[in-house]
């Protein structure tokens, strides 16, 4: 019976050692997974920063050419506004005189389609 008890004790100890080994293996696996996840996150962040840098460079190149177009359009607009302002200054008095003449100089006339009954 003592040998049976000793055999059971050996089995229990072996089971305990096996459980410890399984526990250690799980811990190692979790550490490896955590490390792999951190490395993947770092790689993703590095890739994202690289792509963002490339995007900003392309955006700056596109907006740089757009900025020169914008300044050209603004310059042309100022020139046209200057020309229109000059036309306004030249023709203001004449247009005002014509407008006042149409409003104030009324000549009553009978319409050509009006018939006098008689």
Swiss-Prot record:
The modification N-acetylalanine is found at residue 2. V-ATPase is a heteromultimeric enzyme made up of two complexes: the ATP-hydrolytic V1 complex and the proton translocation V0 complex. The V1 complex consists of three catalytic AB heterodimers that form a heterohexamer, three peripheral stalks each consisting of EG heterodimers, one central rotor including subunits D and F, and the regulatory subunits C and H. The proton translocation complex V0 consists of the proton transport subunit a, a ring of proteolipid subunits c9c'', rotary subunit d, subunits e and f, and the accessory subunits ATP6AP1/Ac45 and ATP6AP2/PRR. NCBIfam families: V_ATP_synt_G. Kidney; localizes to early distal nephron, encompassing thick ascending limbs and distal convoluted tubules (at protein level). Ubiquitous. Belongs to the V-ATPase G subunit family. It comes from Mus musculus (Mouse). The gene is Atp6v1g1. InterPro entries: V-ATPase_G. Subunit of the V1 complex of vacuolar(H+)-ATPase (V-ATPase), a multisubunit enzyme composed of a peripheral complex (V1) that hydrolyzes ATP and a membrane integral complex (V0) that translocates protons. V-ATPase is responsible for acidifying and maintaining the pH of intracellular compartments and in some cell types, is targeted to the plasma membrane, where it is responsible for acidifying the extracellular environment. It comes from the Eukaryota. This is V-type proton ATPase subunit G 1. It is found in: Apical cell membrane. Its main location: membrane. One of its GO terms (biological process) is synaptic vesicle lumen acidification. GO terms for molecular function: ATP hydrolysis activity; ATPase binding; proton-transporting ATPase activity, rotational mechanism. Keywords: Acetylation, Cell membrane, Hydrogen ion transport, Ion transport, Membrane, Transport. GO terms for cellular component: apical plasma membrane; ATPase complex; cytosol; lysosomal membrane; plasma membrane; presynapse; proton-transporting V-type ATPase complex; proton-transporting V-type ATPase, V1 domain.
